[in-house]
Amino acid sequence: MTIGIMSVANMAPLYLGIEHGFFEDEGLDVELVVAQGGAAIVPSVISGDFAFGYGNVVSLMQARDRDLDVQIVAGSTQSAQDEASIANGLLVAPDSEITDLEDIAGHSVAVTTLNNAGELTTRATLEAAGVDVSTVEFLEMGFPEMNEAVLAGHVDVAWQAEPFVTMGESEGMVNIADPYLGTLPRLDAAVYFSSEAFVDSDPDTVAAFQRALGTSIDYALEHEDESRAIVLTFTEIPESVANEMVLAQYSPVVNMASIELQADLALEYGMIENPVDVDALLADGSRAEGE
């Protein structure tokens, strides 16, 4: 069974689960294939090359809007519950005139992909602060390039995630706000998904994957030191940063309020053309019982 993933720290529960045999215990022989990004994973899942993939919620809504029948099968990475555990941020230079969300009006913000999760969460957070988002310019840029671009004055704000938040703060950059938390506590940032064809044809494997992932996430949350250590085996994050960065929040099931809000915002912001059928987007077992 092949899973398409990205080389990011949030893969820690998956790697820990494989290392400790949680997937093998469910009868699953897992092969991980690292892709350049979520955009490359979706077509491989649809074609059947990957049984499962890892990607952000907005991208999956956009895929369904293009009649690609992806389905969320499990949760994964969620935003912080409160200010004490933020792992994302809007970073500015140490000497920036921007000191709060209101100051971002009339400035530029770097996001990894236009019309996607970065822009959606930043817009929602700024609007909640009363900012006229039409005055904000969004620029597309990779996470590794953002901090230096801000420090060099090429862009005013970086929509960042760990470990780049910790790396930026070590250079004196200031985190104005966590746009995920500003949109909604426990916002589902990334999930595991499959194709409807695979979900319908092999529900036993889907259920086994959900159980193994749930066990893996529980283990990761209970063993922070192991989570930090295993990140060093599949990323190029320096050990000093891995030891300091804020670890993501994880959940094997999605937060329904989060999925519904992102669907509404994606439609409002023109990121999709049609309303999302949330029930069709979510496979059995991907949400908490009763939701």
Describe these PLM feature segments.
Residues 1, 24-35, 49-51, 127-142, ...:
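A local structural motif
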Residues 1-128, 156, 186:
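Short, glycine-/small- and polar/acidic-enriched structural segments
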Residues 11, 15, 42, 57-60, ...:
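Extracytoplasmic/secreted envelope proteins and their assembly/folding machinery
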Residues 25, 79-84, 181-184, 250-258, ...:
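Short, solvent-exposed loop/beta-turn-alpha elements that line the ligand-binding surface or hinge
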Residues 58, 138-139, 144-230:
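Pocket-lining segment of extracytoplasmic ligand-binding domains
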Residues 63-76, 126, 133-134, 167-180:
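Ligand-binding "clamshell"
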Residues 200-271:
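Secondary-structure end/capping motifs
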Residues 267-291:
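Conserved C-terminal helix/tail region of periplasmic/extracytoplasmic solute-binding proteins
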